Structures are given as C-alpha cells and as structure tokens.
Amino acid sequence: MPLLDSFKVDHTRMNAPAVRVAKTMTTPKGDTITVFDLRFCRPNIDILPVRGIHTMEHLFAGFMRDHLNSESVEIIDISPMGCRTGFYMSLIGAPSEADVVSAWTKSMEDALNKVPDVSKIPELNEYQCGSYKEHSLEEAHQIARDVLAKGIGVNRNEDLALDEKLLNP
C-alpha cells in the first residue's frame, strides 16, 4: 500500500491551530485542486470531543464557504480527520494561507455569534444528518473560543518532513 502524503509529516512537530497545504494537484483540464490540513489541536496531545467536532463540522462547512469561496476558489468538501485533531478542506483553486487563516478566524467568530442555540445548527435533523443526536453546541463553541484565543498559524511541509528512519517498515 502506498504511503499517503498525510503520513509523511512529523505529527510531533505540528503546531495548532494552524493551516497547512497538504497537497496541490492539477486536473487533466488544468484546474488546481488544493487540500488544506486545518489543524485545530496538537496531535497526540489534545483531541476534539466527538459531539463538538460533529457540531463544528455542520457550522464550519457553511461559514468557510461564506468567507473563502470566490470567483477563483470553490470549496469542494470540509471533513473532520479521523484522529479528531482537525479538518481536511479540499477546494478548487489556490488561496493563500493568509486567506484561509482569515476565513477560518471569521468562521470561528460566526460559530460563536451566529449560532446562539441548538435550533440554529444547520441540518440538525434525522433527514440531513446521519447522527443527528450526537451534537454539542457548547463543545463547538469551546472549540471556536480555543482557536480564537490561541490564534491560527501556518505549518509548512518542509518543516514537518518525517525522517525516513521513523517510518514503519
């Protein structure tokens, strides 16, 4: 099985919250697709709570589109990482890291200011959510407060390159 790009970076050296360009590729038609690692907390040190990350998924997906989509950028998907330390965002285009940081910051502010109670969580029903009872707005708000309090930095692949001696044989 091939070694995926996400496992070629040293997770012990990642800062969080931080943006990282995980991958850039060009489609056969010439479109740029960029995948961002949006790391909310430090791997193996902190972890996002299940209900909180689920609620944040519902909020983050819409708010990031509000603040980042443009004539040259269109978000395809924002999905939580299985390790529950952040989200992957795939998009058409190549926004700057600064633009992503700005959109993420505004999205966290929106999560706190535009969603005052559970009734305002988008798609929170059995028809649109596969686990609609597994949410916590309180935890999502705490995630947003933590991100805003710490500030969002940038992780660079060259700074996180994993020493090949550490790879599993």
Swiss-Prot record:
Q: Which residues bind Fe cation?
A: 54, 58, 129
Annotated transmembrane regions: none
Co-factor(s): Fe cation
Q: Which GO terms describe its biological process?
A: quorum sensing
Domain of life, source organism: Bacteria
Q: How does it assemble?
A: Homodimer.
Q: What protein am I looking at?
A: S-ribosylhomocysteine lyase
